Amino acid sequence: LSALHEPHTQKGSTRCIIHPVCKQPVRRNTVTEYAADMNVLLTYYKCRDDWEDEKKVTALGYSKVLQGKVKKLDQKYPDKSRRIQKLLSELSEMEKSGEKDIDKMAGCFGKIMEEIFAWKQDVWEDTLRRMGFFLGKFIYLLDAYDDVEEDIKNKNYNPFSEQYIIEGFDEQVRRILIMMMAQTCREFEKLPIIKYTDILRNILYSGVWC
C-alpha cells in the first residue's frame, strides 16, 4: 500500500521490546499506522476467540490489554471492523462445526484479507480486494497444510484432515497454492507501483514459498 499510494514517510529510530537497548530505524506513514491498526483488530478478536473456545487465560489477558485501543478502532473504522468481526465469527463457527469445504473456509479468510487490503475507496480498490482475497486464501491453505499432521495428532480441526491420507495429497495442495499465488500476482501486476517493485515481486514470486 505504501508503494502504491506513496504517502509522506517519516524516518527515525526507536527502542522496542525486542531491542530495548539499541534504537532501531523505523519508518512511519499513514499506511503503516493503518496496518498496525488492522493488526490490533485481528489480534484482539483472535484472542477473544481463543478465550471463548479454549479458555486460554493468556488470550483473555492480552485481549483486556487491547480492549481500550480496539474501542477506538471500532469508532475509527466502524464498517471495516464490523465486517472483519463478522467474518472471523463465521470462520470460527465453521471450524467448530467441522466444515469440510476447503474452498469455503479459505474463502472466508480471503474475505478478511480483502477488507484489510481495501484501505481506500478509490480506483484501485477492486484490484486490491482481489489481491487480498487470493493472498488470504493462500495464507489459510498454506497454514492448514503446514499444521495438518500436528492437528490430526492432537485431534484439532483442519480442513485437510480427510484429504491428508489420499495419494497425491501434497501435489494437489501444491497446485492449489500455485493457483492462489498466480491470481494474487496477476492482480499485483495491474497496480502502477514504481517503488519497491523488485522487493515486492521477490516476496510474491519467491519469498512466500520459503
Give residue ranges: language-model regions.
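Active-site alpha-helical segments that house and flank conserved acidic catalytic motifs
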Residues: L1-R27, Y34-K64, T127-E150
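Divalent-cation-assisted or electrostatically stabilized phosphate/pyrophosphate-binding catalytic cores
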Residues: I17-M38, Q67-C108, D126-R129, D151-L191, ...
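Intrinsically disordered or highly flexible coil/loop and linker segments, enriched in small
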Residues: E52, D122, L141, I193-T197
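Long amphipathic alpha-helical coiled-coil segments
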Residues: A59-S63, Q67, L191-Y205
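A mid-sequence, solvent-exposed acidic-amphipathic segment
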Residues: G98-L142
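Histidine/acidic-rich helix-loop-helix segments that form or flank divalent-metal centers
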Residues: E125-L128, N202-C210
